[in-house]
Structure formats: structure tokens, C-alpha cells
């Protein structure tokens, strides 16, 4: 499967206005999206995935085949994505999670607004998203790259990823809103960093900090507008041309608000050096 994309930078002061414009253009309300994104790096040439590794036994045969195909093509950075909600951030109270019988229960008057909503890392769903480096020398003025995704076991994903030749590097959160216009997925989003820790962690977080402690990667608070189309058969030139034309049509519709353009190829290089 191939992905065709255009990107635009959106200043923070323009965010609300653009949301309204996209809602009118697509005749839909935005779908808010929060995602944990874990970055893994290949540290050796992967072999065939061992289907007996931990929770990977729970995967269906077709998912295992897709994972084998994705992870055996070379040495890349890849990301593991898990949906979360704002209620998951700061949800785990240390008192409530410790089993302390004197811990305040939801609804009791302790002088603070306390609500116990545990975030369960063990039940966190994940999917693996592979993105190749964008194709070079394409005549079309859009970013084109090979893409694939597959479901992964829930919970601690580091053990199977390590067994497949991938080590955990870092993680961040992406917050944004999604719109659909025919075959185009429009994603207005920003990257959020976790608060700094005294000691660097070499594994994904099992608990999430309060959402207010998350900070934008871009200090100015700007957002990224991404417009993408997935094409099942990247070898079908007619389908690829049609998808490009649809993106150009959206670019024309939004030209008074933002400048959608092709991304720098090397800025999206996922190869592990």
C-alpha cells in the first residue's frame, strides 16, 4: 500500500479558525484523537518473527504474515501507536493504586476534585505502523511512500519487539483532530513531549502524567496539517495520478488559509543508520 501526502504548518492563532473551515468543507465535526507513539529502532537484521514470543501468540496468522513482511525488509525506525484519552493522563492515583484502605474514594470530600480512573498499560491496544522513506525523483509534487500497519498484542510490547530485532528509543504523544473528505484523511495535529525526568527511561511509560504537564514540541504552539490518501495498489499509475489530483484539489480549496506542499524527503527518512 502507498500513501500520498501534502503538509502545511499552521500557526497557533490560526488553529481554531482552520478547524471551523475544515468542518464546513467536510460537513462533519472534528474527531479528536490522542495517541501514544513509541519509537523502536532495528538493532540487527530481523529474521522471521517467532510466533511463540510472548503475547504474539494471540495474533492471527494473516497479521503475523504482514508483520514478517514489514519487519524483514531492512533496518528501519518504526512506530507503535496506541489510542488514549485525556482521562488516561494523570489518572492513576498513587494512593489508590497502592491499595491503601485509607485512600480517598471517588466522591469523598478531601478538598480536591479526585476521581479514580486507572490507566491500564496491560490492556493498552497497539498497532505497528511502518513508513518507508519517501520515493525519490517523483515527478508529482506530492510525498509518496510505502506504508503498512498491523495489529499487535496488548500491554507490554517491548518483549516481542526486542525479539523481532527492535529496541525502544523514545515516545511522545500526538494530539489532533481528524476530518474525512471523500478519500482524503485530513489531520490537524501537534506533537506533545512528556515532562522531563531525572533519569532517562529505557522502556515505555506504564503511567501517564497529568495532561497539563505535557508540552508542545514546537515551542510556538504551531500545528501540522497533513492531508493523505492511501492507495492499495501503488503500481497502478492511474490510481496514483487520481489520488494526486484529489490532493491538488484540496490544496486549491485551502490556498487562502494554508499552503499545502510536499515534504522534504530526508526529513521523513525512517532508515536506521
UniProtKB/Swiss-Prot annotation:
Localization per record: Nucleus
Keywords: Activator, Nucleus, Transcription, Transcription regulation
Single GO BP term: termination of RNA polymerase II transcription
Region (Disordered): 90-114
Compositionally biased residues, Low complexity: 90-106
Recorded GO MF terms: transcription coregulator activity
InterPro entries for this protein: Mediator_Med18
An example Gene Ontology CC term for this record: core mediator complex
Protein task: Component of the Mediator complex, a coactivator involved in the regulated transcription of nearly all RNA polymerase II-dependent genes. Mediator functions as a bridge to convey information from gene-specific regulatory proteins to the basal RNA polymerase II transcription machinery. Mediator is recruited to promoters by direct interactions with regulatory proteins and serves as a scaffold for the assembly of a functional preinitiation complex with RNA polymerase II and the general transcription factors.
Protein family according to the UniProt entry: Belongs to the Mediator complex subunit 18 family.
Protein's UniProt name: Mediator of RNA polymerase II transcription subunit 18
Species, as recorded: Aspergillus oryzae (strain ATCC 42149 / RIB 40)
Amino acid at each position: 500500500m502507498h500513501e500520498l501526502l501534502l503538509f502545511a504548518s499552521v500557526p497557533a492563532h490560526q488553529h481554531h479558525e482552520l478547524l471551523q473551515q475544515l468542518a464546513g468543507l467536510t460537513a462533519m465535526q472534528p474527531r479528536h484523537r490522542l495517541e501514544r507513539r513509541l519509537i523502536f529502532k532495528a538493532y540487527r537484521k530481523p529474521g522471521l518473527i517467532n510466533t511463540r514470543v510472548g503475547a504474539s501468540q494471540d495474533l492471527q496468522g494473516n497479521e503475523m504474515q504482514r508483520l514478517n513482511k514489514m519487519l524483514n525488509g531492512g533496518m528501519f525506525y518504526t512506530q507503535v501507536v496506541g489510542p488514549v484519552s485525556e482521562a488516561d493522563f494523570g489518572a492513576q492515583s498513587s494512593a489508590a493504586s497502592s491499595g491503601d484502605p485509607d485512600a480517598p474514594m471517588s466522591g469523598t470530600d478531601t478538598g480536591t476534585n479526585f476521581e479514580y480512573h486507572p490507566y491500564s498499560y496491560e490492556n493498552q491496544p497497539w498497532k505497528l505502523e511502518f513508513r518507508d522513506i519517501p520515493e525519490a525523483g517523483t515527478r508529482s509534487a506530492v510525498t509518496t511512500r510505502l506504508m503498512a500497519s498491523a495489529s499487535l498484542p496488548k500491554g507490554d510490547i517491548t518483549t516481542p519487539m526486542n525479539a523481532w530485532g527492535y529496541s525502544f528509543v523514545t515516545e511522545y504523544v500526538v494530539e489532533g483532530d481528524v476530518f474525512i473528505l471523500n478519500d482524503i484523511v485530513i489531520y490537524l495535529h501537534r506533537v506533545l513531549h512528556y515532562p522531563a525526568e531525572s533519569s532517562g527511561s529505557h522502556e515505555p511509560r506504564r503511567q501517564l502524567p497529568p495532561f497539563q504537564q505535557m508540552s508542545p514540541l514546537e515551542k510556538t504552539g504551531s500545528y501540522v496539517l497533513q492531508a493523505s490518501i492511501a492507495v492499495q495498489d501503488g503500481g497502478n499509475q492511474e490510481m496514483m495520478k487520481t489520488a494526486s489530483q484529489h490532493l491538488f484539489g484540496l490544496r486549491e480549496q485551502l490556498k487562502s488559509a494554508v499552503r499545502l506542499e510536499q515534504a522534504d524527503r530526508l526529513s521523513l527518512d525512517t532508515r536506521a543508520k
